[in-house]
Structures are given as C-alpha cells and as structure tokens.
From Swiss-Prot:
Keyword Cell cycle: yes
Organism for this UniProt entry: Psychromonas ingrahamii (strain DSM 17664 / CCUG 51855 / 37)
Gene: tig
BP term (GO), one: cell division
Database matches in InterPro entries: PPIase_dom_sf, PPIase_FKBP_dom, Trig_fac, Trigger_fac_C, Trigger_fac_C_sf, Trigger_fac_ribosome-bd_bac, Trigger_fac_ribosome-bd_sf, Trigger_fact/SurA_dom_sf
Organism taxonomic ancestry: Bacteria, Pseudomonadati, Pseudomonadota, Gammaproteobacteria, Alteromonadales
One function term, GO molecular function aspect: ribosome binding
Compartmental location: Cytoplasm
Catalytic activity annotation: [protein]-peptidylproline (omega=180) = [protein]-peptidylproline (omega=0)
Name of the protein in question: Trigger factor
Domain comment as written in the entry: Consists of 3 domains; the N-terminus binds the ribosome, the middle domain has PPIase activity, while the C-terminus has intrinsic chaperone activity on its own.
Database matches in PROSITE patterns: FKBP_PPIASE
Gene3D superfamilies xrefs: 3.10.50.40, Trigger factor ribosome-binding domain, Trigger factor, C-terminal domain
EC number, as in UniProt: 5.2.1.8
Keyword annotations of the record: Cell cycle, Cell division, Chaperone, Cytoplasm, Isomerase, Rotamase
C-alpha cells in the first residue's frame, strides 16, 4: 500500500492510497471463486458455474464490493499510519482500473485543528454581581397579585395596564398579509407583547371605537417577508378592562402551597427561589463572558462538517420552540445562515474548552457533580427521588459530569483571568436572561 497526504484547503486533507494489483486481484478472484461454488445459475449444476460466467454476470458488483471493503480497510490503516485525526466521515473516490493494474482511490476529509491557547492571564472579563433585596421581594409579591388579578369592564379610554379586547386586520401597501388578522384578541397594554407602537396606539381609545394604527415591523422580526415593513392595522376596540388586584389574605397565600397562610412564610419560600434563580443566572452570565473572551482571544480554524452538524441541531431546537407556540402550517422558514454564527461559536468553544481541560489536566470533581444534582433536584417536590433517578441513570450521570467539568474549566479560567466585578440589580440580571 502506497499513501500520500495532501493539504487542500484549511483543515481539508486529500489522502491518496494505491493498492497493489496482486492484492486487489487476490481479493477479487477469491470472491469470484466463492460465487462460482455457491451461486445458482440456470443451465449449470450447483457448484459448477464457470468463473468466466460469474465474472460476466456479477463482475461489476463484485468489483464494487471489493473496492468498497478495501477502501475502508486501507483507509483506516493509512489514517493510523499518518496519525490523522478525522473530524468527519471521508468522501471516497475510486479511480478507474483495468485488470492487472494497481487500484488507486482518494479520500477527502477534514481533520481536527491543532489548538494553541493564548495565556489565560491575558483575558479581561467583567463579572456581574447582584443580590435579592427586600424591594425585589416586594416586587415579586406584587407580580403574583397581578397574575391572580380580576378584570372589570370600564366605560373609559384605555390606559397602560388595562386589558383590551379587539379585532384587528393588518395591511401592507393596501394588501392584507397572512397572519395579520385576529378577532376577539386580548392584550394587556404596556406588556410589550406586540410589535413596537401597536399597544401605545390603542391607549386613549374607548370600547366601541374604530381606528387605524401605523407601525413598522422590527428589522429582526422572525418572519423574513415582514422585516422592517410599514404596516397599517385597522382596529375595532370591543372591551376595556381594568385590573383589580387581590388582597394579601391567608387564603391568597395558601394558593401558593403555604398551608399556614402566613405572608412571611411565602416570602421566605419566594426568596429562596429568587436566590437560586439569580445564582444560576449569574453563573450563566459569567460563563457566557468567559467563553466570549476565550473565543475572541484565540484564533482557531474549525471543521466545516462540525459546523454543519451544529446548525442541524440548532435549527431543530428552534423549530421545536416555534412548534409549541405556532400553528405547524405557519412555521417560519429557518435557513441555515441564521444559525451559522452561533454554530461556529459553539464548535470553537468546544475545542478551546477541551484544550483548557487537557492542558491543565482537569478531572471531574465528583463533589461538584453531587452539588449540581442536588441543585437540580431541589426544584422538585421530592428531591431524594430525583437524586436517586440521576444516580441510577448512566447517561444522565455522564451528562452531569460533562456539565461539572465544563464549569470547572470556566472557574479555572476566571481564577487566571483579569476579572472586574460589576454590581447590577436583580431585574437587570434576570431581564437579560429573559431577553
């Protein structure tokens, strides 16, 4: 076997392998003789079919079979001999061959990049810091009251925080567009659920009024055909309701699982949840900033095949999210280009974090794994049952170990990098998570 390796472009390699004629013909002839003994052919006794007949009838198929197996086998040997680290499946191309000639094929594929990290000490990272204050807790209680509010119809002009019921029909350049019409639609004014300007255009109008609103779809709107377009909505306002908040009584408190009905117990439970959510949000924020700094400070080539695989994953996740909120028939087109930048970043992060782990010989901290499992379980009614489920599920334990090792790598980078803490409010941190 003769092997040569050529670097074609970026991480792409072209491997050319030549197999001696004797080796190919030996394998080919062996298959022919085997078929001559086992293949049933009309006009010949079993086991007495001439090899010339087998070659004439089945030669092309035998050639394909032998070529395929020899390419796979010799490619694997060549890759090991040349110490190539494949990032994706190869594309084989056999060359034409006459009997008695050597058999040559090429295999084109991408390899993993060689990663050299810049010093972690050179990274500059701003790390958010926040805490849950009494004001944050009071605001959360107020949010709970709003979630359980009643709505009473009023005979006045609509204002922010009112709930309105309306019919609307949108048109662009005088033409009604698909998905731009609804009847009996409820919206709380000021909630920001509609495109900018829509809710504000309803403020000041009373039930029974009909009017138009001129607004523009945002440039980043999910429907490609509507991005940045000017639209006019014809509105018929049928109802205006004001919000009536419930009093904080023992009965109200008991709605949230607090059996004793005491407000202080409810506040204690809510604060625990807020602290846990804030802690996770701060951890995620720090991780994002570490990974961004890591990518920005390290040039790295990445295999196109891995980016394409990641795009498939991201697109599938996006479609699943849309499917929960929209009619399947109205799901938007999601071209690969939408996910390319995010996919490239995720692939780069994988290589760079992997190198941090390898170079610094980081290993899974089982105490951290246990802490992560306990944290995940604490959100359930029966934490012990959830913990046991993790421990008895090999795949879930492996996933949690991967998460732990990744967090260890992030913590290691934070220890080495230049870190500046930035004080923020609970809302600033959590609203960023929602956004």
């Amino acid at each position: 076997m003769q092997v040569s390796v050529e670097s074609t472009q970026g991480l792409e390699r072209k491997l050319t392998v030549t197999i001696a004629a004797e080796a190919f013909d030996k394998e080919y002839n062996s298959r022919v003789h085997h078929l001559a003994k086992t293949q049933r052919v009309d006009g010949f006794r079993p086991g007495k079919v001439p090899t010339s007949v087998v070659t004439k009838r089945f030669g092309a198929g035998i050639f394909q079979e032998v070529a395929g197996e020899l390419m796979q086998r010799n490619f694997s040997e060549a890759v090991m001999a040349e110490k190539l680290n494949l990032a994706a499946r190869p594309n084989f191309e056999p060359q034409a061959r006459e009997k008695g000639q050597d058999f040559t094929f090429t295999a084109t594929f991408e390899v993993y990049p060689e990663v050299t990290l810049s010093p972690l000490e050179a990274l500059s990272i701003e790390k958010d810091s926040a805490e849950v204050t009494d004001a944050d807790l009071d605001k959360m209680i107020e949010t709970l009251r709003k979630q359980h509010a009643e709505w009473n119809a009023v005979e006045r002009e609509a204002a922010n925080d009112d709930q309105v019921t309306l019919d609307f029909e949108g048109s662009i350049d005088g033409e009604v567009f698909e998905g731009g019409k609804a009847e009996g639609f409820d919206i709380v004014l000021g909630s920001g659920k509609m495109i900018p300007g829509f809710e504000a255009g309803i403020v000041g109008h009373a039930a029974g009024s009909e009017f138009t609103i001129d607004v523009n779809f945002p440039e980043d709107y999910h429907a490609e055909q509507l991005k940045g377009k000017a639209v006019q909505f014809a509105i018929k306002l049928t109802k205006v309701e004001e919000q009536i908040l419930p009093e904080i009584t023992p009965e109200f408190v008991q709605k949230f699982g607090v059996e004793n009905g005491e407000l202080e117990t409810l506040k204690h439970d809510i604060k625990q949840n807020m602290v846990r959510e804030l802690s996770q949000a701060l951890k995620n924020s720090a991780k994002d900033k570490v990974l961004n700094a890591l990518v920005e400070n390290n040039e790295i080539e990445i295999p196109k095949a891995l980016v394409e695989d990641e795009i498939v994953v991201l697109r599938k996740q996006a479609m699943e999210r849309y499917a929960k909120e929209m009619d399947p028939e109205n799901l938007p087109e999601l071209p690969a280009e939408l996910f390319k930048e995010q996919a490239e970043k995720r692939v780069k992060v994988g290589f760079l974090l992997g190198e941090v782990i390898n170079v610094n010989e980081l290993t899974v901290d089982q105490e951290k794994v246990a802490a992560l499992i306990e944290s995940a379980a604490s959100a359930y009614d029966n934490p012990a049952e959830v913990i046991a489920y993790y421990k008895n599920n090999k795949e879930m334990m492996q996933n949690m170990e991967n998460v732990a090792l990744e967090e260890q790598a992030v913590d290691f980078i934070i220890e080495k990098a230049k870190v500046t803490e930035v004080n923020k409010s609970f809302d600033e941190v959590m609203n960023k998570v929602v956004a």
